[in-house]
From Swiss-Prot:
Free-text function comment from the UniProt entry: Catalyzes the transfer of an acetyl group from acetyl-CoA to tetrahydrodipicolinate.
Any one GO molecular function term: tetrahydrodipicolinate N-acetyltransferase activity
Family: Belongs to the transferase hexapeptide repeat family. DapH subfamily.
Listed name of the protein: 2,3,4,5-tetrahydropyridine-2,6-dicarboxylate N-acetyltransferase
A Pfam family that the UniProt record links to this protein: DapH_N
Gene Ontology terms: biological process: diaminopimelate biosynthetic process; lysine biosynthetic process via diaminopimelate
Listed HAMAP family: DapH
Keyword Acyltransferase: yes
InterPro entries: DapH (IPR019873), DapH_N (IPR013710), Hexapep (IPR001451), Hexapep_transf_CS (IPR018357), Trans_hexapeptide_repeat (IPR050179), Trimer_LpxA-like_sf (IPR011004)
Organism: Clostridium botulinum (strain Alaska E43 / Type E3)
């Protein structure tokens, strides 16, 4: 079944209709050589096993064989999760440990996603764009090429409450740390958002905005460009 992930109602339907998952990993000290484990993924022999699968299936194996188990340890990081994490193996970008990126996200070539960043379903990250530490890109947020989204900054999602217009950030935009781009706002190419700003209205191309709510304070000039220069070496 296909879904139009540019429509918040379609994303909601996708989440509703997705099979919810509570995967677990269990380390077992015990004899499971005769256990029935066809419905899960497992590894091991000679008294030590690792079981990976849905919690109810793994729990049944543990309970059915509890008389043969000396010890076990269970690891679990989600409950009734509707959307898996993005498969990073095919992404031509640098993704650092601790980034949380849901499935159905598009990440461009040579982009960088730093530790603690969160990127929600339907988001699009352009080539060479950096999403810095602890930044958040909500559902359907769109960042162009060579954007820098500063540490702790937020590009609001448009899933709940539903909105047809996502946040859109043009090419070569720099968004300072801890700024917030509110729902549906568009940032024009080459503009700069000062750190800590709250942007509630569209921003034209080539300007600097600051404050809460953010206002235009100047046009981007050579001095601004010098202070907001991106480093290509970080994207290789």
């Amino acid at each position: 079944m296909s879904y139009n992930l540019t429509d918040p109602y379609e994303i909601a339907r996708f989440i509703k209709e997705s099979k919810k998952s509570t995967p677990v990993k269990v380390y077992v000290n015990g004899d499971l050589s005769e256990a029935l484990m066809d419905d899960i993924e497992w590894y091991g022999a000679n008294g030590f096993y690792i079981l990976i699968g849905e919690s109810d299936l793994v729990a049944k194996i543990i309970l059915d064989n509890k008389h043969l188990i000396k010890h076990f340890r269970l690891e679990n990081d989600r409950r009734n999760s509707a959307i898996p994490m993005l498969d990073l193996l095919e992404v031509e970008a640098r993704i650092e440990p601790g980034a949380i990126i849901r499935d159905k996200v598009t990440i461009g070539k040579n982009a960088v996603v730093m530790m603690g960043a969160v990127i929600n379903i339907g988001a699009e990250i352009g080539d060479g764009t950096m999403v810095d530490m602890n930044a958040v890109i909500g559902a359907r947020g769109k960042l162009g090429k060579n954007v820098h989204l500063g540490a702790g900054a937020v590009v609001a999602g448009v899933l709940e409450p539903p909105s047809k217009e996502p946040c859109t950030v043009g090419d070569n935009v720099l968004i300072g740390a801890n700024s917030v781009i509110l729902e549906g706002v568009k940032i024009g190419a080459g503009s700069v958002v000062a750190a800590g700003s709250v942007v509630a209205e569209d921003v034209p191309e080539g300007v600097v905005v600051a404050g809460s709510p953010a206002k235009i304070i100047k046009s981007v000039d050579d001095k601004t460009k010098g202070k907001t220069q991106l480093l290509d070496d970080l994207r290789k």
